[in-house]
């Protein structure tokens, strides 16, 4: 249950810090970082997700263990350069393979292996 409604979840937020919520309590700590990829309920995530939540969140460990936080702009996955796509190495965003010719990049060094990407 990652939604923050209910009696178990309450905290005040300092706008200069990130709100870190666990399943049972909330703690404000500025140094916690998202871990990518992370495993949650049998799936691997390479970026922040809305799974089981109204807002995008990430795990603070490689395998979700109850430590997580809402994602800020700086938490989202970054392009991994260089990356491999269809056996070719790219050192910048590409429109190759994009149906609508929109620039994209892999968020892992090997798109062919992981299939994880984002728009540039």
From Swiss-Prot:
GO terms for molecular function: heparin binding. Major component of seminal plasma. Residues 29-73, 74-120 form the Fibronectin type-II domain. Glycans are attached at residues 5, 12, 22, 27. Keywords: Disulfide bond, Fertilization, Glycoprotein, Heparin-binding, Repeat, Secreted. SUPFAM superfamilies: Kringle-like (SSF57440). It comes from the Eukaryota. Could enhance the fertilizing capacity of spermatozoa upon interaction with heparin-like glycosaminoglycans present in the female genital tract. Belongs to the seminal plasma protein family. PANTHER family: SEMINAL PLASMA PROTEIN, SEMINAL PLASMA PROTEIN HSP-1. This is Seminal plasma protein HSP-1.
